[in-house]
């Protein structure tokens, strides 16, 4: 089966399923629970591959009148074969995206779920740098920037969620005369968590427009 669900759509589905679980815990009226369940199913169904066995199994799993968080956590991974995974770049491929970095720290690939990644981000605590690989149409853009050591509670410019954010600043060339400017914003310190919260890629593209190198 050809994967058709994007990572941010997968995150959106998960958020709606988790909201359904929360509603089950908060709402005692059986009829109201059935209405909320029907609304959730109606929302997530268009994202799913039509007629696929995993779609049928997933929707069937949403039918019980009470769905626990533990049950939801087991149900959601059923969709992963239908989710487009983020590519696992080789050391050489990453080196081409960050040509000016001599000793590029590699991402901790083993700890990442590629089905959850709309973009790739990892920290180099030794140099206080953060590296981002962001899709841009049919290619990928590598962004290297300074990551402030301080973490605050705030809204992430990428996932638009309140959490632990740090100031990320990149240096970009603004003209052919050698003029440079520093641009950035507050983003999640933990990029894996950021991806799990990202349901709309537009904010990511807006962020890229601010920090990307200018041609």
Each language-model region and where it sits:
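General detector of N-terminal leader/presequence modules that precede the first folded domain
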Residues: 1-96
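Generic preference for well-ordered secondary structure
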Residues: 1-4, 24, 28, 59, ...
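Sequence-level detector for tyrosine residue identity
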Residues: 8-10, 24, 43, 119, ...
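Generic hydrophobic, helix-prone segments enriched in Leu/Val/Ile
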Residues: 13, 17, 132, 204-207
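Generic alpha-helix signal with a bias toward terminal, lower-confidence helices
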Residues: 29, 36, 56, 79, ...
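Short N-terminal helix-initiation segments at or just after the protein's N-terminus
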Residues: 66-80, 125-137, 208-213
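Long, positively charged binding patches that form subdomain-scale interaction surfaces
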Residues: 93-163
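Cys/His-clustered metal-coordination modules, chiefly Zn-binding fingers
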Residues: 138-215
